Amino acid sequence: MIARIWSGESPLWRLLLPLSWLYGLVSGGIRLCYRLGIKRAWRAPVPVVVVGNLTAGGNGKTPVVIWLVEQLQQRGIRVGVVSRGYGGKAASYPLLLTPQTSSAEAGDEPVLIYQRTGAPVAVSPVRSDAVKAILARHDVQIIVTDDGLQHYRLARDIEIVVIDGVRRFGNGWWLPAGPMRERASRLKSVDAVIVNGGVARPGEIPMQLAPGLAVNLCTGERRHVAELSNIVAMAGIGHPPRFFATLEACGASLQKCVPLADHQSLAFNDVKALVTDGQTLVMTEKDAVKCRGFAEDNWWYLPVDARLSGEQPDALLEQLISLAR
């Protein structure tokens, strides 16, 4: 229903317009206060790069963060990552991740980023506190913040926005009548726009999510997902249909698709009940972070990597490297 409202297919969005105007007034007022200096942002002693979006829902932001961190690491840059830690609840903040940190504490995306990149990762509702926690323990040259475009309390040097190239901005209205956190005109003031799928417009960086081999949660075995049989697909991400379409594009034959809420907590009995004997469960890598501790041998996940094309990604990386050095 939400997808139909935000796309404009359902006329119910009109009933939510008063709330959207209120949301837009408040969010616009907050940004204006920081631009005018009425409120002051905290500036870190190292460059800060924000990777965020203008819309609610999955846009492929986390794969971009992982790509960015890995690319900088390969070029000898020491990177730290901060996040709000949505879906997690720590005993105290800021929380600096360790190999023992669970997604229940830090949120699934920060744990995934930590496992994939090995970079220092810290979470806190106040992102400046997360930055300070990293700087107190690690000699990093640059900070990448996963989400937080609208978190103006943290000053930033570079802003990168990720857009779903198929859905883009839906009906164009602020939350809750539409998917927008800020107006589309906000793109004029950011440093880079990355478009996940669809057709990129002039000046935008095209991106695709490239799937890898499916990985068994228990054994670590890797196989092409098309070799797995009787697949039940599970996705607890911002836009589950994208994951299901990716599986089908890889040649997987899906018996059932189970969309879950983004950041939804997962328990063994609930996940086990999704499959019967002879079926194979395939989930996103983000869901695997939450299931690894109680997985069964017929549970697999499909990792995806961001693939950016054109000359703009190299120019963006060079800009970040020059800032970091």
Curated annotation (Swiss-Prot):
Class in the EC hierarchy, top level: transferase
A Gene Ontology term for the protein's cellular component: plasma membrane
Enzyme Commission code(s) on record: 2.7.1.130
This protein's pathway: Glycolipid biosynthesis; lipid IV(A) biosynthesis; lipid IV(A) from (3R)-3-hydroxytetradecanoyl-[acyl-carrier-protein] and UDP-N-acetyl-alpha-D-glucosamine: step 6/6
Key word Ligase present: no
UniProt record, GO biological process: lipid A biosynthetic process; lipopolysaccharide core region biosynthetic process
Keyword terms: ATP-binding, Kinase, Lipid A biosynthesis, Lipid biosynthesis, Lipid metabolism, Nucleotide-binding, Transferase
Pfam assignment, any one: LpxK
Residue numbers binding ATP: 55-62
InterPro entries noted in UniProt: LpxK (IPR003758), P-loop_NTPase (IPR027417)
Catalyzed chemical reaction(s): a lipid A disaccharide + ATP = a lipid IVA + ADP + H(+)
Molecular function, one GO term: ATP binding
Transmembrane stretches, start-end: none
Record PANTHER family: TETRAACYLDISACCHARIDE 4'-KINASE, TETRAACYLDISACCHARIDE 4'-KINASE, MITOCHONDRIAL-RELATED
Family (UniProt): Belongs to the LpxK family.
Main function: Transfers the gamma-phosphate of ATP to the 4'-position of a tetraacyldisaccharide 1-phosphate intermediate (termed DS-1-P) to form tetraacyldisaccharide 1,4'-bis-phosphate (lipid IVA).
Name of the featured protein: Tetraacyldisaccharide 4'-kinase
Organism listed in the record: Citrobacter koseri (strain ATCC BAA-895 / CDC 4225-83 / SGSC4696)
Lineage, top ranks: Bacteria, Pseudomonadati, Pseudomonadota, Gammaproteobacteria, Enterobacterales
